[in-house]
């Protein structure tokens, strides 16, 4: 399903949600990557599952750039994701786990530029994932198949 829009005025807000738990070695690169995005309409939400390894201390250092963050026990990744979704107010939601990064500081802007070329807004946006090792060397792309609404409904 797509929605009509005035593509010249399109400036959607992206709610980017990072879920983390005891990721002290990984979370900072993700925070810096999202906070360095050139696109201005980003609502960044971080949900930490009550880490005990210093993860929350790192998140706290960047809280001025966050729309919301919390560090508290949860019932697992899906509970944490739902907490993030409850706080999200954007037009689109984008999950980026601790340790993951966007391709460049212009990734969100590139997505918006592509949206502006469309005649209608999509309900779902997805792309390829570049799998990398600890040294950030590419191990290959993971391509998603086209999404069908029949698979998304109950």
What is each stretch, according to the model?
Residues 1-33:
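N-proximal low-complexity "stem/linker" segments adjacent to membrane-targeting elements
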Residues 72-88:
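Glycine-rich, basic loop-to-helix element that forms the pyrophosphate-binding segment
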Residues 42-50, 70-71:
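Short beta-strand/loop segment that forms part of the nucleotide-sugar
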Residues 105-139:
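Conserved donor NDP-sugar-binding/catalytic core segment of glycosyltransferases
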Residues 48-57, 97:
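A conserved acidic beta->alpha catalytic loop
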Residues 93:
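Short aromatic/hydrophobic "clamp" motif used to bind/position activated sugar donors
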Residues 150-154:
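Conserved small/polar residues in nucleotide/adenosyl-binding loops
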Residues 33-41:
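Short, acidic, metal-binding catalytic loop of nucleotide-sugar glycosyltransferases
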